[in-house]
Amino acid sequence: MNTQILILATSAFFYVRADKICLGHHAVSNGTKVDTLTEKGIEVVNATETVEQTNIPKICSKGKQTVDLGQCGLLGTVIGPPQCDQFLEFSANLIVERREGNDICYPGKFDNEETLRKILRKSGGIKKENMGFTYTGVRTNGETSACRRSRSSFYAEMKWLLSSTDNGTFPQMTKSYKNTKKVPALIIWGIHHSGSTTEQTRLYGSGNKLITVWSSKYQQSFVPNPGPRPQMNGQSGRIDFHWLMLDPNDTVTFSFNGAFIAPDRASFLRGKSLGIQSDAQLDNNCEGECYHIGGTIISNLPFQNINSRAIGKCPRYVKQKSLMLATGMKNVPEAPAHKQLTHHMRKKRGLFGAIAGFIENGWEGLIDGWYGYKHQNAQGEGTAADYKSTQSAINQITGKLNRLIEKTNQQFELIDNEFNEIEKQIGNVINWTRDSIIEVWSYNAEFLVAVENQHTIDLTDSEMNKLYEKVRRQLRENAEEDGNGCFEIFHQCDNDCMASIRNNTYDHKKYRKEAIQNRIQIDAVKLSSGYKDIILWFSFGASCFLFLAIAMGLVFICIKNGNMRCTICI
C-alpha cells in the first residue's frame, strides 16, 4: 500500500501592543451628592455645606459694650420702675433682655409696644434731658405700693399729678416742650384708668377728664375709663403709656385736667446697637455678630437652620437642613473592572449648551490634579496630571461660596427693606407674612445652590472636553480615537513623545510618515468590532469544509488507483 504523508502547516498569530495615550479625570471612592436644576443626588468629588446648624449656647460678647438688663425690661429704661434704676441712662452696642425682666411696676401696658421695643433695641443706649415742666395747684408726688424702693414710690421718669387735696378740683393745664436737639426725642406719657369712679374723683376731682396731645405730626385725645379690673401688684387701676418721636425743632403740647401721668425727662437714643432676648450666659471669651434666643451663631456660610428670629450679621434662615454646594467635578468612582487605560465614555449636552463631560469613569489614583493622562508605550506605563486645565477649573470655582453669599445678601436685603417700610406704616409684620418670607428665602436658597451646582458640573466637564480636543488636534491622522477616551498612536511614541503631547508641543509632521505606513498595514487587516465574531465563525466553518473536501478527494484518488479498497458488509 502506497503511503502518503500529509503535512498540515499552521500559522502563528501574534499581537503587537500599540502605543496609547488616554485622558481622564480625578475620582474618589465616595463622593458627595448634590442637587442641580435638572437632577437630584448627583455625586461630585468635592462639595461644601452652605447651611449652618451649629449653635453656641452662649452670648459671645467679646469686644462688645454689653448691657445685661437682668430684671429690668427694655421699655422700663424710659419710664423708670425701681428694677430699672441703674439703666435709666446707658450706652451699649449689645443689649440683652432677660425673661425675668419687667417693664412696669404699677400695672399697665404700652401702646404699639413692639415697635417701641424695636426702636430701643437699636438705640445704642439712652440719655435723658429734663423737659422743664413745673406745676402749681396740684401735687406731683403721687406714689404707689406697687412701685416700692425703700417705701412706696413711682416711676422715676414720670410724674403722677394729683389734685392738691383729696376730691379737690384739678385745674386745666397746658404744658409744652420743644426739642432743641439735632436728633429726635422719645416722649412718653401715661393715662391713668382708676379702679373706680370714686377713686378717680378722689384723685382728680369730679367731672369728665380729657387729655389731648399734639405736635406737628401727631394729635390724639384720651378719655380715662375708670372701673374695676383684676388686681395686679395689689392694684385694680391701670396706666396706658403712649409715646411719640419728636423731631428736632418740633414742639409737643399736653393739655389735661386730670388722670395724666406726665413725662419728666425726654429720652434720646445714643447710636446703634443690637438688642436680643435670651437667657443664655454671657461669654466674654468669644466673638459674635449673630444672636438669637438660644445663643450665638458664628458662621461664614450663607444660610442657617438654627433660628428664624436671629438678628445681626447672620446667615439667612432657610427650612432646609442641608444644601450642598459643588466645588468639584462630577464623580464616577473607578470600578475594579475598569481600572485600566480604557474607560467608557459618553457625550451629552449640558444645561447651558456646552458639551458635558464625557469620560464616565474617573481615576482614583489621579491625586495631583483634576485632569490628567495615562499612557503606555515600549517603556511601560505612566500617569501625569494636567495642571493648566486643573487650575482653569479651580480659578472659576474659587470664591463660589462668597459669590453665593453676595447673591443671597443682595436678594434678601431688598426683601428686608421693603418689609421695614411696611412695619413703619402698619406695625409689625404678622406671623404668616414672616413664614411666607421664609418660604421665599428657602426657595431662593435651593434655586441658587442648584444653579451654581449645574454651572460647576458643566464647567468641569467643559474643561475635560477642552483637554481632549487639544490632544486630538495635535495628533491628527497620527492616531485614532478608540471611543473610550484613548488615542491609539500609529508610531512609536517614547516618554519624551508622550510628554510633548501633554505639553502641547507635539510635532505631528515628525511622525507622519511612520504613522501613515503603520495605519495602512493595520487598516488592511482591521476588522470592525461589530462583525468580528461573525467573520471568525465563518472563517472557521470555511476552513473545516475545505479540510473535509481535501480529505474526501484524497480518499477518492486512492480508491481509483487501487491503493485503497472500500468493502461494505451487510
From Swiss-Prot:
Superkingdom, natural source: Viruses
Signal peptide start-end: 1-18
Subcellular location: Virion membrane; Host apical cell membrane
Cytoplasmic side: 555-570
BP GO annotations: clathrin-dependent endocytosis of virus by host cell; fusion of virus membrane with host endosome membrane; fusion of virus membrane with host plasma membrane; viral budding from plasma membrane; virion attachment to host cell
Intrachain disulfide bonds: C22-C486, C60-C286, C72-C84, C105-C147, C290-C314, C493-C497
Extracellular side of membrane: 19-533
GO molecular function: host cell surface receptor binding
CC annotations in GO: host cell plasma membrane; membrane; viral envelope; virion membrane
The protein's assembly and partners: Homotrimer of disulfide-linked HA1-HA2.
Misc note: Major glycoprotein, comprises over 80% of the envelope proteins present in virus particle.
Name this polypeptide is given: Hemagglutinin
Chain's gene name: HA
